[in-house]
């Protein structure tokens, strides 16, 4: 009888432990983050949250012929159809407004409208654009960023960044006043491209990861000696989504002319500058971006880069294929 009583006691204890475990699991499920249950609009942020690499393309564009003469010009509709014909790109990138938003905005707006008419949305083709340098004119930078966001973009890249303060100013320009920012209350055509109401857009068009439910992302690029000197202070600014070394510009900084006038790259110094930015990304737990090609994307993934942009065309398409295979996507 004594042994039977002990067996019943063990059974009761086991049942009690299981019951407590089930209650704890239920409580954890009931207190899950609402952001996890809300449908993510911007798939780029979804990939970040999943720890996945991502691969994007420069938007196709009309090119100049020899001597600057215009070749056969494609319409915005044709460019949009060309864009949507390649489905392996996680986002569409454009540097067309780096020199001047005012000059390039009309063509970009027409292109985005053509994308929308062809069926694109933030869910299928999120858009990222370069904005001109911020530090030279802070007031103009705020207007520029607002105008770009109003076209429906979900990411803005700050170029030539050299200080933490200019990053903070740019990040504020991406956020409405209700979220502590300086963006105008005008939303332009952004809700239409996102496929949501204006009211919902105002709620969701905030900066991730500062707002875990936000759908906007910032990219910041360091591409000068001063920027490199301040890269840790820049990377420490909360709100940067992806930090990039400006590989092309940095290549120029670490190149000289030989006796015949040819360019000579200091490969070691150039690579050290790239690794300096990558080290800052790792220290402050920020995704790091790189403009890779099919020959180096595997190496860059191994080093720790996770966001890549490629030029439009066959070489870029091949690079995405190589990158997806190397990253397990």
What residues fall within each predicted segment?
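N-terminal secretory signal peptides that target proteins for export/translocation
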Residues: 1-11
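Sec-dependent N-terminal signal peptides
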Residues: 10-20
């Amino acid at each position: 009888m004594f042994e039977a009583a002990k067996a019943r006691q063990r059974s009761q204890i086991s049942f009690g432990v299981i019951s407590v475990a089930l209650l704890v699991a239920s409580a954890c499920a009931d207190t899950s983050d609402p952001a996890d249950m809300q449908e993510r609009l911007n798939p780029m942020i979804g990939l970040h949250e999943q720890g996945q690499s991502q691969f994007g393309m420069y938007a196709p564009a009309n090119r100049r012929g020899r001597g600057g003469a215009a070749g056969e010009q494609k319409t915005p509709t044709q460019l949009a159809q060309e864009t949507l014909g390649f489905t392996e790109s996680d986002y569409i990138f454009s540097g067309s407004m780096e020199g001047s938003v005012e000059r390039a905005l009309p063509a970009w707006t027409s292109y985005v409208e053509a994308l929308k008419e062809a069926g694109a949305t933030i869910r299928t083709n999120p858009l990222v654009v370069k904005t001109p340098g911020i530090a030279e004119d802070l007031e103009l930078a705020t207007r520029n960023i607002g105008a770009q966001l109003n076209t429906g973009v979900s990411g803005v890249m700050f170029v030539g960044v050299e200080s933490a303060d200019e990053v903070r100013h740019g990040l504020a320009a991406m956020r409405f006043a209700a979220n502590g920012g300086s963006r105008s209350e005008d939303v332009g055509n952004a809700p239409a491209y996102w496929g949501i109401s204006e009211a919902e857009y105002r709620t969701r068009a905030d900066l991730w990861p500062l707002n875990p439910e936000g759908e906007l992302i910032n990219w910041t690029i360091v591409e000068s000696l001063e920027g490199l000197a301040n890269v840790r202070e820049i990377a420490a600014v909360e709100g940067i989504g992806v930090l990039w070394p400006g590989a092309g510009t940095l290549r120029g900084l670490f190149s000289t002319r030989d006796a015949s006038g040819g360019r000579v790259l200091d490969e070691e110094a150039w690579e050290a500058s790239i690794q300096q930015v990558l080290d800052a990304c790792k220290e402050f737990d920020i995704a790091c971006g790189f403009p890779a090609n099919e020959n180096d994307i595997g190496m860059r993934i191994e080093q720790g880069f996770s966001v890549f942009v490629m030029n439009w065309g066959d070489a870029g398409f091949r690079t995405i294929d190589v990158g997806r295979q190397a990253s397990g996507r």
